[in-house]
């Protein structure tokens, strides 16, 4: 690390800089600090290099720690009498160190996906009486994929609890989505009731940390793009590519399963006012195939808080302005009734709308 740090310092302070001292100052719950004493053209200067301990306090992933330091660099110098942050430094896989600080915004460059997203299929279900072979093959492809990625497990109570906490409290999840609602969409006390029920579910699920699995994190129809050419790697007649993996690579498989299956319910309510036809068939088939492939029958006993989050998403007027107030009421009724039930029953989904 010291050689990499010396190379970084020469880039920032000039090639004549010399690292005179590099020693650990101490460590606490959050992380450790290191004293840097360097000889520059302007004289000897002392700095502190700070790190954050992984796993715990929301610092579980490198991106978490980067976010803390980027905010620190942005805000330290704006408060009177506060020490100033000089830079934010990243360490690469090869051990080299590089500045990532000073940006006013950040961007992600990624590959382009081609094909048709699964929203198109869900809309077309409204014109069918039953699923056709291609519809069933797509569900087979999606459940097979999820069964495969969810088979990768990780032993970490911290990360499982983090995912449970984020499902309710993250800015992109239940509470954050509710905060984005236009006033009048749902009374605040009704939002709070859903949140409180979800928190109670989190307490029930905490002992289930052995379920921690590799997940996509946002497995919804807009992020699933089906191609027109088959791929033998999936061993199916259908292939797809995914977008926008989100909010961490580890969690409960219920996160991915509910992200997709809420849409059979949502689209059916939107088009038909109840859950029936190809939508009900798709919902049942998805759970049937997934449980058969994974043996994870327990999943049906813990989907409730994940459905609360996903229900809040599809009922959001900002995301789906075409939804009528009556349809939103059905979705919120579904959410509350699922939260009140001990086990989700896909075959009786319409009972949750009453």
Model segments located where?
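Conserved protein kinase catalytic core
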Residues: 56, 117, 224, 250, ...
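Active-site catalytic-loop/activation-segment of kinase and kinase-like phosphoryl-transfer enzymes
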Residues: 111-113, 159-204, 316
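All-alpha amphipathic helical-bundle segments outside canonical DNA-binding/catalytic cores
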Residues: 295-307
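Active-site acidic catalytic loop and adjacent metal/ATP-binding pocket
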Residues: 24-39, 43-44, 48, 149, ...
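Regulatory N- and C-terminal appendages and interdomain linkers associated
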Residues: 1-47, 56, 60-67, 79-85, ...
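A glycine-centered beta->alpha junction motif in the catalytic cores
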Residues: 54-55, 112-131, 175-184, 266, ...
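Active-site activation/catalytic loop segments of kinase-like enzymes and analogous catalytic loops
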Residues: 247-250, 254-294, 308-326
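Conserved ATP-binding subdomain of kinase catalytic cores across diverse folds
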Residues: 29-32, 39, 44-168
């Amino acid at each position: 690390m010291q050689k990499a740090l010396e190379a970084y310092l020469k880039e920032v302070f000039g090639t004549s800089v010399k690292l005179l001292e590099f020693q650990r100052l101490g460590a606490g719950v959050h992380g450790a600090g290191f004293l840097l004493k360097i000889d520059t053209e302007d004289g000897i200067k002392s700095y502190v290099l700070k790190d954050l301990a992984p796993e715990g306090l929301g610092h579980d992933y490198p991106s978490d720690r980067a976010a803390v330091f980027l905010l620190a660099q942005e805000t330290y110098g704006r408060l009177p009498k506060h020490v100033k942050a000089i830079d934010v430094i990243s360490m690469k896989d090869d051990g080299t160190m590089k500045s990532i600080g000073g940006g006013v915004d950040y961007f992600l460059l990624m590959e382009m996906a081609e094909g048709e997203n699964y929203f198109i299929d869900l809309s077309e279900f409204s014109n069918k009486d039953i699923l056709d072979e291609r519809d069933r093959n797509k569900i087979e492809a999606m459940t097979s994929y999820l069964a495969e990625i969810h088979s990768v497990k990780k032993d970490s109570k911290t990360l499982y609890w983090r995912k449970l906490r984020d499902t309710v409290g993250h800015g992109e999840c239940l509470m954050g989505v509710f905060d984005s609602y236009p006033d009048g969409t749902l009374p605040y006390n009704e939002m709070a009731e859903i949140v409180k029920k979800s928190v109670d579910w989190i307490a029930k699920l905490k002992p289930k940390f052995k379920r921690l699995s590799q997940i996509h994190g946002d497995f919804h129809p807009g992020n699933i793009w089906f191609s027109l050419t088959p791929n033998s790697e999936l061993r199916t007649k259908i292939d797809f590519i995914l977008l926008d993996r989100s909010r961490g690579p580890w969690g409960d498989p219920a996160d991915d399963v509910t992200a997709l299956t809420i849409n059979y319910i949502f689209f059916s309510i939107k088009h038909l006012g109840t859950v029936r036809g190809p939508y009900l068939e798709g919902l049942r088939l998805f759970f049937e195939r997934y449980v058969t492939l994974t043996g994870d029958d327990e999943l049906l006993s813990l989907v409730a808080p994940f459905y609360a989050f996903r229900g809040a998403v599809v009922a959001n007027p900002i995301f789906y302005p075409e939804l009528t107030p009556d349809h939103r009421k059905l979705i919120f009724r579904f959410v509350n009734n699922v939260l009140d039930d001990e086990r989700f029953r896909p075959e009786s989904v319409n009972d949750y709308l009453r």
